[in-house]
Regions:
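Active-site helix of classical SDR
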Residues: 142-149
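N-terminal Rossmann-fold cofactor-binding loop
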Residues: 31-35, 50
Length: 314
């Protein structure tokens, strides 16, 4: 049985990956640091400071697959006001992990990048559409270059043919275990929290609500990872992973309210800064090479997340 270690196992994506692979034919390990780990008899938890090379080396020893799901993340407020918090620790951490995985000759390394380096377009974006010489959205400048740097580290190590690397440029992920703290959450988590906790059937949305996002249910992301583990042949691949469909923030709010069976009035706070971008992913490469496609429609994913939220948070 292959040993898979999920770094950042107590985070949103990490926890979903742990639960997903614990039901598959893998020996699952997960790291945690400050955040207490959850109970699951099928997962072996290891305490690890991922900024400490010695601790990382110990955790990665004798593993077959490393999933880099650990990162310092937050929502639009921090991206605008404190963008530097996403750069330093993540750059150091990713450098330490990839070096350790290379030194220990771990067969497969999976890195979660994102899509903030992409430029807004009116068509679906392919992996090769990214232009390094084109100016990146100022709000994403630091975070985007941190991700690009980490992608290139993976590509660099892959050239030695010691191990295999998968880079995942995923869209906006949502689902159970997401961040629902209004100070730290992304658009989906923040919008759902406002609606489900509204006492006066009214919520406030930042800006005009016209910003559009490509949303993907977290189970579909987990399924992609499984297929990459089983089917990727080349030593380095970059994949777009998203729904390929855009929805505005205000229409997302309406969908969540409908699924929650709540009548909600939307108010728009034009004094709040928003990040204007339009990025819809072309995922034909993932489909062609791995046979991956979206299984969970947005309405289904919203409903599943609402049920989880009501059971675990409210």
């Amino acid at each position: 049985m292959k040993k898979i270690i999920i770094l950042g196992a107590t985070g949103f994506i990490g926890r979903n990956l742990c639960e997903y692979f614990s039901k598959k034919n893998y020996s699952v390990y997960g790291t945690y640091n400050k955040k207490k780990f959850f109970k699951n008899k099928k997962i072996k938890f290891l305490k690890c400071n991922l900024l400490n090379k010695k601790q990382v080396d110990n955790c990665l020893k004798n593993k077959d697959i490393v999933i880099m799901a650990a990162a310092t993340t937050s929502g639009a407020k921090d991206i605008i006001e404190r963008p530097y918090i996403h750069v330093t620790d993540n750059s150091i951490m990713n450098s330490i992990i990839t070096r350790s995985a290379f030194d220990k000759k771990i067969p497969h390394v999976i890195f979660f990048s994102c899509t903030i380096m992409y430029h807004s377009q009116n068509r679906k974006i392919k992996e090769e559409d990214f232009n390094l010489n084109k100016k990146i959205n100022p709000n994403y400048f630091g975070g985007a270059w941190m991700k690009i740097f980490s992608e290139k580290i993976c590509e660099f190590y892959s050239k030695f043919k010691v191990n295999k690397y998968t880079v995942i440029r995923h869209s906006n992920i949502y689902g159970p275990h997401d961040k629902f703290d209004l100070q730290k959450s992304h658009v989906f988590g923040a919008t759902m929290t406002k609606i489900l906790n509204s006492n006066n059937n009214e919520i406030t949305i930042w800006g005009k609500g016209n910003e559009k996002r490509d949303l993907l249910y977290v189970e579909d992301l987990c399924n992609f990872v499984e297929l990459a583990i089983k089917k990727q042949k080349n030593s380095y691949e970059v994949f777009n992973v998203g729904s390929g469909k855009l929805i505005s923030v205000k229409n997302l709010a309406k969908k969540i309210a409908f699924q929650a069976k709540k009548k909600i009035k939307l108010k728009f706070d034009l004094t709040k800064k928003t990040i204007k971008s339009r990025v819809s992913l072309n995922c034909s490469k993932a489909n062609k090479i791995l046979g991956w496609k979206v299984k969970n429609r947005l309405d289904f994913g919203i409903n599943k997340t609402i049920q989880w939220y009501k059971k675990n948070i409210i």
